[in-house]
Amino acid sequence: MYCGHFGFSEKPFDMTPDPKYLYLNRNNKEVFAALKYGIRDRRGFISIIGEVGTGKTTLLNAALDQLDENTKAAYIFNTSVTFDKILATTLFELGLKKSDESLSKIHAIDRLNNFAIEQLTAGGNVALIIDEAQNLDMKSLENLRLLSNLETRKHKLIQIVIAGQPELDAILQRQELRQLTQRINLNR
C-alpha cells in the first residue's frame, strides 16, 4: 500500500540486505572505506563489530559487489558449522572444489594456499568474508588465525574479514584468542 502512495516501484524495507539500498552515514562510510582498503591493500585480518540492524551484512554485500575483478572472494554466512565446513565452502565458492569432493584439512589449505599464490603472481587477491562471526566456535577462530599465516615475505595471501555483533568483540578479548586479536589490522 505504501509503495503506491509514495511512488515506489518496489518495497524499500525488505527483510533481505540489498546493497542498492545501502545508506552510508558517516560511520558506515568510514567502515565501508576501511573494509575496501583493508582487502585491496592486503591488511590481512579485518573485523567489523556492530549491533543487530546496523547494516553490517549490507556493507559486506556492497563491498563484494565493488571488489575489483582481480579479487576472488568467498562469502560465508552460515557460521554454526565446523571450520572444516567453512574451509570446504570457501574452496567451493572460489571454484577450487566440487561440492561432492572430499579433502583433508591439510590438502584443502594447501589448495587454497596455491590458489592464493597464483592470484598474487597474476596481480590478484583473495578475500574470505565471514558474516555472523559471533557464532564461530573457539576452534574455528583459532583455525582462522592459522589460515592468516598464509603469506609471503611481503604480502598476506588471504584477506580475512569477520563481521558480527558485539558478542564477537567480547569473544575476541578472551585470553586464549590474544594471538588472533593481535593480527587484526583493522577493527571497526
Predicted regions and their residues:
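Walker A/P-loop nucleotide-binding motif
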Residues: 41-62, 79
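Conserved NTP-binding/hydrolysis module of P-loop NTPases
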Residues: 8-13, 72, 82-100
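A short, basic N-terminal segment
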Residues: 1-42
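Residues immediately C-terminal
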Residues: 54, 132-138, 146, 167-168
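Mid-core helix/loop region of P-loop NTP-binding domains shared across ATPases and GTPases
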Residues: 82-85, 97-143, 152-155
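A short helix-turn-beta junction within AAA+ P-loop NTPase domains corresponding to the substrate/partner-engaging
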Residues: 69-72, 175-188
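Structural recognition of the conserved hydrophobic beta-strand(s) that form the central parallel beta-sheet
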Residues: 49, 127-131, 158-165
